[in-house]
Amino acid sequence: MSEIKLIVGLANPGAEYAQTRHNAGAWYVEELARICGVSLVPDSKYFGLTARAVLHGKDVRLLIPTTYMNLSGKAVGALANFFRITPEEILVAHDELDMPPGVAKFKLGGGHGGHNGLKDIIAKLANDKNFYRLRIGIGHPGDKNKVSGYVLGKAPAKEQELINAAVDEAVRSTEVLFKEDMVKAMTRLHSFKAE
């Protein structure tokens, strides 16, 4: 397995979106930055908030695109190209409708599952889908016509607690990833379910 050199948290920019379900990926990167003791700062060259962190002696770039979600690939492509980071060295954290709140899972490759942020990243990486994902469960509204309003809405307090617990566990599992390997990180994270 390649070492992860770039961790991306997907989000929509602006205060009105900060607490919406669609921004779960950004919550994870913000927490990772906090435990690494680094500040995410705006960088127009990479169309996002970026930081350089060190996790268990390994350098990693953190990125939260500040474009809208459906243009996330612009930021990821710009930073990956500049630092010559390959898709296999990228971990993208995003909200996942097909998993309940309180659960998060790592995954390598796959499609975009209708997620516009992932769709744009795949396009900007020359259709290479072979990057890692951290899927953060937000649950599903039960009707595909309600998805847009659902992801752009705030979770009720109990659901938010579950999502936050999964994000915290994902951060701890990321430390395992950098200290040991992806298999151990997956084993830890995939056995977790906040109640």
Curated annotation (Swiss-Prot):
Name the record gives this protein: Peptidyl-tRNA hydrolase
Catalytic activity: an N-acyl-L-alpha-aminoacyl-tRNA + H2O = an N-acyl-L-amino acid + a tRNA + H(+)
GO MF entries: peptidyl-tRNA hydrolase activity; tRNA binding
EC category: hydrolase
Homology family: Belongs to the PTH family.
Function: Hydrolyzes ribosome-free peptidyl-tRNAs (with 1 or more amino acids incorporated), which drop off the ribosome during protein synthesis, or as a result of ribosome stalling.
UniProt organism field: Shewanella sp. (strain MR-4)
Positions of the record's site feature: Stabilizes the basic form of H active site to accept a proton: 95
NCBIfam families for the chain: pth
Subcellular location: Cytoplasm
CDD domains per the UniProt record, alphabetical: PTH (cd00462)
Gene3D superfamilies according to UniProt: Peptidyl-tRNA hydrolase
